Design a protein with these regions (language model features):
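Membrane-interfacial, low-structure loops and terminal tails that flank and connect transmembrane helices
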Residues: 1-11, 84, 194-206
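Transmembrane helix-loop-helix hairpins at the membrane interface
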Residues: 23-42, 46-202
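Interfacial transmembrane-helix boundary/kink motif in multi-pass membrane proteins
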Residues: 1-27
Length: 206
């Protein structure tokens, strides 16, 4: 639908809220593992650092991680989750199995929390994958893609958010906020429609 479509705005709002839930789940899991001696790290390296070091980090991270969010959510949730639900009829299977695979496939990214042990990283991302799996079945693909996009933008813009330059920090914060634009636009459009409705005089009966 159009960006002013209330359904799109609602998906955007839900995506941001789901992203906050994922952040809370990740934080709790990382802190719990940290108390057990796990090593925590969050510093993009290798291929994932290229976007931050490009001529236009804002555009590069927006486009690159939108592609990542689309591919991963289509693969893990839309295709695998839907297929498992149709085959088993069990929602928990459609949520948990793709989440486990999602967590395991991210173990090589040792800059994600937690750095060590490797299974801690798999556990954290499996929990996040379960949130996205539940959200996909509850709210649909668009909300989950926007949530995933928001999460990746935050994680991989972290070095810029922690910079000493206020302009860089502002640009990074605005980049992370981009998935919330449909929610803002839809809210403004709804406000305009309500204002116009109040100004329209009632039709006089003949």
């Amino acid at each position: 639908g159009k960006i002013t479509d209330p359904a799109v705005g609602l998906a955007s709002f839900r995506g941001v809220m789901i992203g906050l839930v994922c952040g809370g789940v990740m934080t709790f899991a990382v802190l719990a593992l940290g108390l057990g001696g796990a090593t925590v790290s969050l510093q993009p390296r290798g291929f994932f650092f290229y976007a931050l070091n490009s001529a236009s980090p804002v555009l590069s991270t927006l486009l690159f991680f939108l592609n990542v969010a689309l591919l991963e959510e289509l693969g893990y949730r839309f295709f695998a989750g839907t297929w498992l639900l149709e085959r088993t009829g069990r929602r928990w299977v459609a949520i948990v199995l793709p989440a486990i695979v999602y967590g395991l496939t991210h173990t090589r990214l040792d800059f994600l929390p937690v750095a060590e042990p490797w299974w801690g990283r798999a556990l954290v991302l499996t929990l996040v994958g379960c949130v996205w799996g539940w959200a996909f079945l509850r709210f649909g693909a668009l909300a989950v893609v926007l949530s995933h996009w928001t999460a990746d933008l935050f994680i991989f813009n972290w070095p810029r958010l922690a910079a000493d330059d206020s302009m860089i920090v502002t640009a990074a914060a605005l980049t992370v906020a981009v998935p919330a634009i449909p929610a803002l636009v839809a809210a403004i459009a709804a406000g305009i429609r309500r204002a116009r409705g109040r100004r329209t005089p009632p039709l006089e009966s003949a």
